[in-house]
Amino acid sequence: MPGLTIGDTVPNLELDSTHGKIRIHDFVGDTYIILFSHPGDFTPVCTTELAAMAGYAKEFDKRGVKLLGISCDDVQSHKDWIKDIEAYKPGNRVTYPIMADPSREAIKQLNMVDPDEKDSNGGHLPSRALHIVGPDKKVKLSFLYPSCVGRNMDEVVRAVDALQTAAKHAVATPVNWKPGERVVIPPGVSDDEAKEKFPQGFDTADLPSGKGYLRFTKVG
């Protein structure tokens, strides 16, 4: 469905949450945030996901990333459900806020509606959507999963690392990249510019085409 996507400014919505009223742009501030939706409280896959989010909170804190959840259940439902989440994974405290969107207007604006999943009243449910939003309030990366597939927190962390590395060093990250591994130099950077920008040097792959577009370097 059309809607919020990479490069768009996230709507500055204000919603009730488990931490009181939250205005999204104020919550972002000058940091990255992970804005994620879940189909419903007191459901099995969502319980495992939000418990994992809580367990990874320290990893996100290290990277200066804040978590912000949203679903269509009301705030009291969220608060009651958190007790189950924390009981399921003792030690994983849900310290991040979860916003309430019973009208479903926010999830529509955030492009988080699952077209195939509905509640008992026929109302659309949120998908397992996740937007990584940058300090400029723009969506940097989005994941969209169906209700039957839980998200992979290791991949979310890896994506954050890749985005922050790319932004800091003006590079790109190749397939399956992890921190400490080589990055690639974007094709818009000439070899002369690359020599200045990356004094540590770079390697160019020897390809049959003879085109020197695949260049690897290391960054700190």
Curated annotation (Swiss-Prot):
Disulfide bonds: none annotated. GO terms for molecular function: thioredoxin-dependent peroxiredoxin activity. It is an enzyme of class 1 (oxidoreductase). It is found in: Nucleus; Cytoplasm. The active site is at residue 46. GO terms for cellular component: cytosol; mitochondrion; nucleus. It catalyses: a hydroperoxide + [thioredoxin]-dithiol = an alcohol + [thioredoxin]-disulfide + H2O. Residues 4-165 form the Thioredoxin domain. GO terms for biological process: cell redox homeostasis. A motif (Bipartite nuclear localization signal) lies at residues 195-218. The active site is a conserved redox-active cysteine residue, the peroxidatic cysteine (C(P)), which makes the nucleophilic attack on the peroxide substrate. The peroxide oxidizes the C(P)-SH to cysteine sulfenic acid (C(P)-SOH), which then reacts with another cysteine residue, the resolving cysteine (C(R)), to form a disulfide bridge. The disulfide is subsequently reduced by an appropriate electron donor to complete the catalytic cycle. In this 1-Cys peroxiredoxin, no C(R) is present and C(P) instead forms a disulfide with a cysteine from another protein or with a small thiol molecule. This is 1-Cys peroxiredoxin A. It comes from Oryza sativa subsp. indica (Rice).
